Amino acid sequence: MAEEEPRIGVYVCHCGVNIAGVVDVKEVAEFAKTLKNVVVARDYKYVCSDPGQEIIQRDIEKYDLNRVVVAACSPRLHEPTFRRCVEEAGLNPYCFEMANIREHCSWVHMDDPARATEKAKDLVRMAVAKARLLESLETIKVDVTDRALVIGGGVSGIQAALDLADMGFEVILVEKEPSIGGRMAQLDKTFPTNDCSICILAPKMVDVSKHPNIKMYTYAEVVEVDGYVGNFTVKIEKKPRYVDEDACTGCGACAEVCPIEVPNEFDEGLGMRKAIYKPFPQAVPSVFTIDEEHCIRCGLCEEVCDADAIDFDQEPEIVEEEVGAIICAIGYDTCDPTEREEYGYGVYDNVITSIELERLINASGPTGGKVVRPSDGKKPKRIAFIQCVGSRDPHRTNPYCSNVCCMYAMKLAQLIREKYPETQIDIYYMDVRAFGKGYEEYYERSQKQYGIRFIRGRPAEIVEDPETKNLIVRAEDTLLGDVVEREYDLVVLSVGMVPRDSADVIQEVLSISRSPDGFFMEAHPKLRPVDTAIDGIFLAGACQGPKDIPSSVAQGSAAAARAATALAAGEVAVEPIVSEVDEEICGGCGTCVELCPYGAIELVEKDGKLVAEVTAALCKGCGTCAAACPSGAMEQNHFKTEQLYKQIEGAFRDPA
């Protein structure tokens, strides 16, 4: 294609008035006709429309065009549209070039139409200069392993695994903790229906364990991922439980005789568990785990285990799995409230977090569902909730809203009022964000039916009465314009969501990006909300950002659907705009290997010397290697050095 005489068609889009309201599009089209190798140039109101595309296709046939340039909006928006358009007319889709005269001209130079028009001409001249050297490229096809990996066994990961398994794909589910279930397993009820949380979750957990297409690794972590979309090799480290999962019946005799008690993490340290334990009654798998750090190896559990399931000889084990797609659903942590020193968490016994209250009010919690003060075990008569602890605080903690705190505070307040109607409850808030289906009605019900008082103002300080252990909350009521000071028996901090501690490791293992707030970054917030920048790796649930249970479940299903798109096809198409190596001049220095952000390049030995080799399925065409190569051995398809030089020359003059 590059050797034949270029015959170029140029099409200038009005984009309604987005471009034509500033840029003189007719003048730009007339200018394009003067450029070498341009056979036809037109302007049209909406080139991306069906009639606009038909004009291009007719011209390709009529004028025997072998290159097409469209001057319009961002390539991110309509480049795929026009590539498909020219391909349908028999032209290679990579013999198309786009000049962005909307974002780069009309939108940024609205106050200077004349200069915007001249700049548009420059961009068209540059695009035509590059188009003369465009080459036909062929899409790369990659075979797909029709299995998926789901990292994280919370409700979002569970939903993703079940959806994929129900579609007929084999799923590998990896959970870091001894049981799947995640945060939802800790909750008592779910808003806005106040349904029993575990009653909803437990059947899905059982479905995962029983599904013939799901292989579950609990108490395990993904430690290494190699490969690319359709062909990932995953290494999983199984931590030793010191209990044979296949032999254990979950009877609990071992825990009954174990002499060691330690704070129970599942109950947020409010209750105790044994050194051999099951996280919660509905745990899946329903087997016990020995806490190596606290076990004293007394042997009592071995003596009473009729199933002979205790195995102190277990060691960490690495297993390897081949998958075609990966869904990351590792969930979230709650923020550390000690960062807000003025609230006294960790100093005052009766200042607790919302997740601690969840465990107190839960019938399977450390108090059997009784809400009591940690200081003396008495039932609190006056309770204050403080919102936005760790959220919407750009100077001290996190700038973002955690989405769920307003709603779960109302839920907990309602549950307390149902159990103890005489309890007085105040919620100190900045703004109530009741955005979901049925949430506004839930908010109104909290006030009118349950008598919960909402005080608009962020408390400045909490102090403790040393004799009664009661807490005095000082805040400004911004609606009344008064400073209020009220005494409470218990203060609950509504803590926000933060990224998991393990997010650093997962980011490195998967080579995915994180947004400034620390959560994993999606490829596009609107158009590709569950994709990552790495093909074949998807996001689900709160690891991508704070969200409630319905949104997490929906995103789990969305991620499963996106993964299934690749798995079901049997092969995936990889864009050929990738780097290639001229092995004759490659010196094997490894600069490209070190700089490639996608791990797409490695050094291999060929004919007795080291040369770089690009895995096309991993390459994203970013051009880092081509820019850094000291010998000029790296060239990126569609952005080759000569093409870019001609484009640069075109910025100043017609290089022809």
Curated annotation (Swiss-Prot):
Q: Which cofactor does it need?
A: [4Fe-4S] cluster; FAD
The residue ranges of the 4Fe-4S ferredoxin-type domain are: 238-269, 286-315, 577-606, 610-639
Q: Which residues bind [4Fe-4S] cluster 3?
A: C586, C589, C592, C629
Could you tell me the superkingdom of the organism this chain comes from? Archaea
Annotated [4Fe-4S] cluster 1 binding sites: C248, C251, C254, C305
**SUPFAM superfamilies named in the record:** 4Fe-4S ferredoxins (SSF54862), FAD/NAD(P)-binding domain (SSF51905)
Give the Gene3D superfamilies listed for this entry: 3.30.70.20, FAD/NAD(P)-binding domain, NAD(P)-binding Rossmann-like Domain
Q: Where is FAD bound in this sequence?
A: 152-175
The note on cofactor binding and number reads:
Binds 4 [4Fe-4S] clusters per subunit.
Name under which the protein is recorded: CoB--CoM heterodisulfide reductase iron-sulfur subunit A 2
Instruction: List the lineage, top down.
Output: Archaea, Methanobacteriati, Methanobacteriota, Methanomada group, Methanopyri
